[in-house]
Every structure is written in C-alpha cells, then in structure tokens.
C-alpha cells in the first residue's frame, strides 16, 4: 500500500508542475483578431487579458461611433476563438 501511495503522490506532483508550466505559458501566448480588413486589431494573451488594440484612423467617424465598437467586438471575438481552440487542444492532451 505504501508504494502505491508514493507513486500516486509523485504523479500528482508531476501533474501539478505541468499545470503550473501551462498556466505560466498562457501569459506568454498571443492571439490576434482583426476586423474590417485590418481597420481594428486586438491582441490578447492566453488568459484573455487585452494586450493591445490598434485602430486605423480611417475608421474613426464621429458621426458613427458604433462602427468602431462593432469592429472592436468582432476583432476581440476572433482573437478569443483562436485562444479557445488552442486551449481546447491543450486540455485534450492533459492526463487529468
């Protein structure tokens, strides 16, 4: 019984280390979404933190601010979809 417990404890320690490494790598990953043929682009990390937003001045219309809002939402959605796909793949390879 003792050796089985030690083995499980060692496996748990390895899984914990893998999880911590994966979590740290999420901060380094970058996912970009663009909308309006590149008029707006956003970059997020693997924790869905917004890293950068770029807006081309040609899409700034004071008469129609909803355009920029729509483009921002679309770009963010694309970046998040990329992140979600990769996270799903990463989870499928985890042993737990």
Curated annotation (Swiss-Prot):
Its main location: cytoplasm. InterPro entries: YbaB-like_sf, YbaB/EbfC. The keyword DNA-binding applies. The keyword Cell membrane does not apply. GO terms for molecular function: DNA binding. It is found in: Cytoplasm, Nucleoid. GO terms for cellular component: bacterial nucleoid; cytosol. Keywords: Cytoplasm, DNA-binding. Pfam families: YbaB_DNA_bd. Binds to DNA and alters its conformation. May be involved in regulation of gene expression, nucleoid organization and DNA protection. Homodimer. Belongs to the YbaB/EbfC family. This is Nucleoid-associated protein CPn_0039/CP_0736/CPj0039/CpB0043. It comes from Chlamydia pneumoniae (Chlamydophila pneumoniae).
């Amino acid at each position: 019984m003792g050796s089985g417990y030690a083995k499980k404890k060692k496996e748990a320690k390895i899984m914990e280390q893998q999880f911590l490494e994966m979590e740290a790598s999420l901060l380094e990953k970058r996912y970009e979404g663009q909308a309006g043929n590149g008029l707006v682009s956003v970059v997020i990390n693997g924790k869905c933190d917004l890293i950068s937003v770029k807006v081309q001045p040609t899409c700034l219309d004071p008469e129609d601010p909803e355009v920029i809002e729509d483009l921002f939402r679309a770009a963010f959605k694309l970046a998040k979809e990329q992140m979600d796909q990769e996270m799903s793949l990463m989870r499928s390879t985890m042993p737990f």
